[in-house]
């Protein structure tokens, strides 16, 4: 953090009460004459109920969700800018974060830089205004699972319900209709071309 800029603060605090370093939380509150905007970065994988390896770049939902609640209730913050560069991750955690952003009464803007893949799509459209950089990419794909599947019919039904939750969220928070979103999600030729 630049100590010569008193109008820029870092998000979060240590238990001791001092400001938490920007590199720790990836967020900053920027004060200008026009208002106070909190920037939040969502990068790497969205970490949910399973811990990811310590060398993986992650966004932890247990850090982001209370921060979003605090921002919504704060009289000192006028709006939220979400900077996204994520490969996706935990569906439940990603949808939880997206629902919180979508339910905020303050102005919210999302900007996809690099990538907004998988569960990053609902996160991208959760803000009241969403933008994607010309050099960025987004991947829409059906819900998938790594590992052993026991009870295939039950697992398939569960996947269908999760996919429907994602589809409903995206169509409710964007201008895409269900048929178009489903068609894009199932274009396996496009996905193969995108990821090689």
Task: List the predicted regions and their residue ranges.
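STAS-typified acidic loop motif
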Residues: 4-5, 17-62
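Glycine-rich beta-to-alpha active-site loop
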Residues: 83-97, 102-147, 191-192
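Charged, glycine-interspersed solvent-exposed loop segments at helix/strand-loop junctions
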Residues: 80, 141-196
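A short, well-ordered alpha-helical element
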Residues: 52-78
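Structural motif
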Residues: 39-41, 79-83, 111
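Catalytic phosphate/metal-binding cores of nucleic-acid and nucleotide-processing enzymes, i.e., regions
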Residues: 6-8, 12-21, 29-36, 70-73, ...
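Extracytoplasmic/secreted proteins, especially bacterial periplasmic and envelope-associated proteins
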Residues: 63-66, 96, 161, 165
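Soluble non-cytosolic domains of exported or imported proteins
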Residues: 58-62, 91, 153, 157-161
């Amino acid at each position: 953090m630049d100590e010569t800029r008193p109008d820029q603060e870092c998000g979060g605090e240590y238990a001791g009460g001092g400001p938490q370093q920007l590199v720790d939380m990836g967020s900053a509150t920027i004060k200008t004459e026009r208002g106070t905007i909190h920037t939040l970065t969502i990068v790497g994988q969205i970490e949910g109920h399973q811990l990811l390896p310590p060398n993986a770049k992650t966004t932890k939902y247990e850090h982001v969700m209370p921060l979003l609640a605090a921002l919504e209730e704060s009289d000192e913050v006028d709006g939220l800018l979400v900077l996204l560069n994520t490969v996706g991750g935990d569906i439940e955690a990603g949808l939880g974060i997206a629902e919180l952003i979508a339910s905020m009464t303050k102005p919210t803007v999302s900007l996809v830089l690099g990538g907004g893949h998988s569960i990053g799509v609902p996160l991208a459209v959760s803000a009241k205004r969403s933008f994607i950089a010309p050099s960025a990419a987004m991947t829409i794909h059906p819900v998938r699972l790594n590992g052993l599947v026991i009870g295939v019919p039950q697992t398939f039904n569960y996947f269908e319900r999760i996919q429907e939750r994602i589809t409903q969220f995206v169509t409710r928070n964007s201008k895409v209709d269900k048929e178009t979103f489903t068609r894009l999600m199932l274009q396996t030729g496009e996905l193969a071309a995108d990821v090689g």
